[in-house]
Amino acid sequence: MKFSAITTLATFLAIVNASLCTYDDHPVNGLRYYIGAEGVPDVLGICNGFWDNVKPQCGGDWQCGQAANGDLHAEFQAYRKCLPRFINDGWWYATKNQWGSIECKLRQ
């Protein structure tokens, strides 16, 4: 599942040249967010800034870094109190939407 999520995210980003956020809602495990952006020159710096903005509301198991194709890829598990708007706002504060805005959507 992890490979398919990363592949789907990378394919989508290559098509639209933008940023993307999706999430899964698991009955037991809570929410799992997937964030991606292409063209980010300082992936580690943006990852750290983004997580600094999101961590107070969301906490959780966090992974963020550069994908094999060079794009930023982040994913993390959080409790249901971690609303999509916290992610959207955290991205804006970290990037000022320089690589596109995100609006987290539930995966169907």
Please place each PLM-identified region on the residue numbering.
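Intrinsically disordered regions, especially transient/low-confidence alpha-helical propensity segments
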Residues: 20, 47-48, 59, 88-89, ...
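A general secondary-structure boundary signal
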Residues: 15, 25-26, 73-77
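Extracytosolic low-complexity repeat regions of secreted or lipid-anchored proteins
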Residues: 63-107
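Fungal secretory targeting signals
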Residues: 1-20
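Short, surface-exposed binding/anchoring microloops in extracellular/periplasmic proteins
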Residues: 19-56
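Acidic, aromatic-enriched beta-alpha/helix-loop junctions
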Residues: 49-70
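Residue-level signal for mature regions of secreted extracellular proteins and peptides
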Residues: 11-14, 40, 51, 57, ...
